[in-house]
Amino acid sequence: MMRVTKKLYALLIAGMMAVSLVGCQSTGNSSNDESTQNEQSSKGSTNSSTKSVSSDNIPDFSGNMTVAVDNNDPDFTSKDLTTKSYESYSRLDSEGRCQVAEACVGKDIMPKGKRGAIGMVKPTGWHTAKYDNVDGKYLYNRCHLIAYQLTGENANNKNLITGTRSFNVDGMLPYEEMVGDYVRETGNHVLYRVTPVFDGDDLVAKGVQMEAMSVEDKGEDTVSYTHLTLPTTPYV
């Protein structure tokens, strides 16, 4: 298990190329069934934070996958600390875009089975883009804000944004696995929040900010972070 001795609050910067594996699904299995995009309620708390992140605060991409921000401090308070597992997904905004997704990840809400199909969900900015020089061929993918491995949330349109393989695998996945491994190995809980960052009326997020903090030890000896991916559209 990957452990850190201080709170890690990182802004993930990813130049998006190719398709995603874990947390995202290739566009090749896209469905035309729009009726399955209806809003799904969370399995726990519904009081997700209205926290937002301004794209103005995101550093320009400099080739680095991650860059620390806000002194490595996640934005959770003592009142947020709870050992009761929950997951919560904000309502889509007026443009139909995902907003904040939040959870207290515990073993009791982690999935016991394999992830199901998510091709019926079409996040904002979605279209099929296929290139021979892209790994897996399909450039754009459906990316979970809160990974399936953490809460078992599958085809929820409040939890899926348009992204790419680099965005997911090189950026989000290491942190998702850090959280998942910690919870599975210790039985403790992790506060976890993912906030998409949109620039103006753009339908594809500029990135996502991810925060996590272990509850039982208040993040002092385990996992705590945030990261952001930029851009979710490829450089051309």
Regions found by a protein language model. Give the residues of each.
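C-terminal motif of bacterial Sec signal peptides marking the signal peptidase cleavage site
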Residues: 20-23
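Conserved small/polar residues in nucleotide/adenosyl-binding loops
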Residues: 226-232
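Hydrophobic helical h-region of N-terminal Sec-dependent signal peptides
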Residues: 13-18
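Betabetaalpha-Me/HNH-type nuclease active-site subdomain
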Residues: 81-156, 169
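N-terminal, intrinsically disordered, polar/charged segments of Gram-positive cell-envelope systems
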Residues: 28-78
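Bacterial N-terminal signal peptides that target proteins for export
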Residues: 2-11
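Short Cys/His-centered divalent metal-binding micro-motifs
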Residues: 160-185
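A motif-centric signal for short, conserved binding hotspots located
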Residues: 186-219
